Structures are given as structure tokens and as C-alpha cells.
């Protein structure tokens, strides 16, 4: 079998005939199958191969079954690696990026992926940037984007800001450098405006998205209901607080309010800036040290300092000390927490560390802290009530007395989208001393190409002819915004643009007719690591564009498949570990079909896949067997018709196994509960080939191959196209119905019981009479019945025979 030339032959045929372009007929049933677009790093890895093989199998199956399939591919082509390559290799980021895209396109073709070429683009293309900048301006004008100065996550290595979601355990999501805090101006997208809708709409995705992803998004949004109220600054401390009269806090445990013995505020809280002037030099030094620590460092060890001021408890009127604590977060709630050591692990640990008093407010004084809800004591009029009852009554009291109010809080923060780098989509805003921040009118704002990338700061800041411009409103001298957009903006709407052919999107982001027809994406495939980054942002962006009038849908992805990682020797493949498998080498040695077959057979999509060279060789041998056995079949110019009546057992088994595989194929591709277990489908195909190989009835072989090649076409397309063309001609190769007669069993297995207790099984002909079955059953149970008196014989058709004995 010359797999290299066979694969090359059909790849050329597919591209020449535009075999994978969707039709413009909106009356056809459609399927939009999409794998997450890759970053053009230069060469694809086995993780790419797995992701795109899964998607391609789905796309090819639905095409074969007469769906109008959109299966596009593009490139998420802005980002820091291109700048790093520019520094390392002395090559322009644009040149590096587009050379890599060209190389990856060839690799995709070599694997036989059936992508639509007429939808392809890179997110760094100017015509893509143009509409992204238009969206940015529309969002700004609608009030969904704002700009403010704040302490931000800063990656010292990449020299850029990171969103909260891009900080993983205190480190940069891309380069793993420890993140620090830095105060900068930043543009924010108001994702918090959509927190409730993002949370509520997760319900519609249940049974369609992995539960783990839904839980991760729910936890990240972090909805909580509680009491918001204030501790008034003690009169003698007001001067030190420079006009700040109250510390506002939020708590989900209003029932523990009588247990407050301190207030913890974030180092960034506005109160600190004023009160720090009156504390000792040692305390001031400690507070400043906390300010300079990373979130990861703050999580490792609790630290704090007494700020020297007190606030008044709203119920007891006692003075409560105010502490700066590194576990209080400025970007959550009001940046202030009430410390209840008797009822909270963190508060208890902090109180013990700094010898802060602990007030017990539950009936059980032992084994502090009491984090579970209990009956209260030392809680005023709410003593002797359960925590849940007291909580509701205390909130009602605060609202009645205008001391506070019930509020909903979310852990989710607004999405900071400014990045201090060159290779990104320019933010289309102008800074004018007379007009303020003004949107650019000439789009797209493109990047200058005559830049120097040396790794020191943002190159756009140093590019005078690009940076200095005129205000589009008053035409006076102004400054262009030098920050570029977070690349997650590009990946938040690319799936919408794919819907529209290239020749119809020059003057529009996407065509409404194509959009309404193809959206939402029917099946979306990518790694679970995108659960609270890309997937959450894409859901938000879809809703925001809907509210701008661009869309008429709420959710972009109907079904989600999160494929597991590809491992070797139990670890994720990486160059540093020396366990990388090169797709190029695999294609050269075994071919694309063997690689695809192994990928789908080795593990279900959601599970991790352990690389196995011998299993890959086994996949290669299976394809060769399939090919070689086909040589025994005389080509036919029409669909094979099965007319045999009298068959032996081997022939019946051959037909049965083939149609069992066909039935499983429909289940695997069409039923979500199957979890796309291609491994079980391929195992069925292997059984079917074994059964066909055991007999030489040419009609059965011909019929069997007609069915088997249809099942395998989505998995090993080159081999399937080659054999189906040779044996049947492609124009005759239409989906075949399941022959239910072939699945009928000649025998049935009955349970044999005595007085209801199972003793044996009996395999009998399915047409056997009751009398024949009773005789055979008695013979099978002879040793149990020889000395017994049978009182009654009960036959339950197709299930069991029971003998009642004395």
C-alpha cells in the first residue's frame, strides 16, 4: 500500500474540487463544527493533531450524511511570542507570523483536515482588525468600555498587563513568570454588567457542556448574596482619615456580626493612604512591603499591621481596630472585610498570629473556629436563634433602620484589555488635551512596520510619527493610544466571522444571513484550560455584540468537547522534557490515516491520551489489512445489493458485525451521551473486518466494504476515498440504511431458575417452541431436578425458565 501517494492524490483532489466549502443554500440542514483556532507558532504539535482530528471526523461524518457543514480554520496570530521571536532571530513579528501560518497550513493539509479555505483568516489581518476596532468604539460609546488607573497584574518578563483570569497561581499564564502589582491606566470591558446573565445562561448549557467547565465558570463568576453596611470611623480618628467617615464591608454571614473583633482592609484601600502617615515607621514599612508583594505571595502567608484607627460597631457601639491585611483584596467587594475569628478559618489564623481577641458567639465554645452554622449566643436579640434564621432577621433589621442593605456580589471583575506591546490590535482611541479621549474615525488603525523591538517597554511609545497625530474632532495635535488589545478579544468573536465567505466580508464583519443560518456553533472543541478565559470572554462578547445590534443570539456554542492532553511517559509533551513526538515524522513513517486512527482509538476525547508507538503501528497494520483484503473484491459500478437467503454462521456473523458497527457509528456521532467514544466504534470496525476476513462470499464482502468504508471515511478519509472509488465509484457511495434483519439473533440466552434462584443459562434457537425449551431446560438442570418433584413449569418468553419444586 503506497499511503504517501494515495494521501497526496486525494488531498490534491479535495482542494482542486473545493470539496469542503459549504453551500449557499440556507434551506439545507446545517452543522457548524469548530475547533479552537491555534496560535501560529510554526509547527503543529500532537495536541493540535488530536483536537483537529476530532473535529474533522465530525465534519466528514455530517457531510457524508448530507448536512451543509461549515468546518473552518484560522489563526490567532497576534501575541507576545512574535515579539520574542523578533528579538531572538532579528525578524519582524509580521514576517515571522505569516511564514508560520503558511507552514502550518501545509501541515493541516497533509493530515487531510477538511477545512473550508474560503473562510480562513488570521486575526492580525487588517480587515479583521478594522471591525474589531469598530466594535471597541461601539462598546466605548455604549458605556461598556471605560478607562481608569488601577493597581494591575504586571508580568516583568513580557512587560505587559495581565487580566485576573490570566494569572494562574500568581504567575503569568503564558511564560510562568511571577506577577507583580503596578499602577497604570487601563481600558476595561464591563463584563460585570453581564455577570448574572452569564451565570443564568449556564443552565441552558447543562448536558451540552462538560459539567467541570460549567462549575469552573460558575465559581469564577462567584455570585454571593449578603449584607452591605458600614462601620463609622471613631470621632477621634476622623482627622487621620482625611474625611473618610465610614468603612463599607460586605458579608455573606450577617449572623456572625456580633463576633467581629477587627476589620481587615486591603493595602490598596483609600483609607491606608491617609492613615499610614500617623503610624510608626516600622508599620509603614510593613504596609508598603505588602503592597509590593504578588497575589501568590499574599496567599502563601498572612501578614498585616494595625493602622492605628478604630471604627464603631453598628450594633454594639464598641470600638473595632482596623488592620491592613494582605488577604483583603482591593478588587473584591469594597476592599474591606469584617474579621470574625470564632467563625472563620482565615480570620481565626490572623487573630492568633497578631493576638487579636476572639469573641465566641455560638453555643459550642470548644474547637474554634465554628465555620458551620449553629445556634447563636452573645448576639443580642438574635441569641438562641439558628444562624440561618438570625441572618435573615439581621439583614431585615439593617434595611429597616437604614444601616445597610441586602446586595448581590460577584467575584467576577471587569476585564482589563490594555496591553503594553507592539504585536496586537491597536486600541483606536486618541488622547486630546481639548476633547479628552476621542475615538479614531479612520479604521483600521494599523501598526507601523518600521519599528525596533528590543524587549524594553512598548515599541509604539517610541514611534513618534505614529504616536503623534491629530484629534479627529478638533484637528489639534493629539496622542494616539499606544496600548494594544488583549489577544483574547480577537478570539472572542472569530467564530462569527467564519460564517461569511471572504468575498462578502470586505465591508462588514459578517453577513447577517450567513450568521443567522450557521450560528450557533453546533460543536466546539478545545482544551479545558480555556474554561474561564476564552470560553467566558466569548460568551460575554456574544452578548455584548447582541446588545449592540450585531447579533440575535445569546450563546455562541451549543455543545462543547474538551479534549484531554496528549502525554508521553505520563507527562505532557514538551521540548524541555524531551518527550515530544513530531507529527511530521509520524506522517512520513505511517501516514495521516494511521495517525488519525491512533488518535481516535487510543482514548475517548475527554480523557488524556498516552502516546504509544506500538498502538500506532497497530493502527497502520489495520489500514493495510483493510486495503489488502479489498483486493479480493471485484469492482462494481453500482451500490451492492444483498440477495443471499441461505447463509452459514460465518456469513451471518460477517453481516451482523458490519451493521452493528454502522449502528454504533450513528450513536457515536449523534448522541451526546456517547461522549464521542470513537475508540469503541473503531473496535467495532476491527471486529467487523475480522468477521469479513473469515469467509469469502464476494457479495457479503462487497456489501461489508460498502458499509465499513462509510463508517471509516471520517476517521481514515484517504484510504476510504481510495477504496470506495476503486470498488464502487464515489458517485454511488451514498449512506446506506441499517439492515435490521442482519442484526437479528438466531439464538437467545435464557436464565434457568429453580424456585426463583438462578442456576444456569440456556442458549436455544430463537424459533424453538415452549415445549422444546422446557425439555432442554430440564436436561440442563438435571442434577438439580433428579430427586425433586416439579410442581410447576414457568416460561417467560425470551427471558427465563423457572421450575417450582417441592
Curated annotation (Swiss-Prot):
Top-level EC class: ligase
Motif 'HIGH' region location, chain numbering: 38-48
NCBIfam families: leuS_bact
Organism annotation: Helicobacter pylori (strain ATCC 700392 / 26695) (Campylobacter pylori)
Coiled-coil stretches noted in the UniProt entry, renumbered to this chain: none
Protein name, as recorded: Leucine--tRNA ligase
Main localization category: cytoplasm
Binding site for ATP: 575
GO terms, biological process: leucyl-tRNA aminoacylation
A Pfam family: tRNA-synt_1g
Subcellular location: Cytoplasm
Family statement drawn from the similarity comment of this UniProt entry: Belongs to the class-I aminoacyl-tRNA synthetase family.
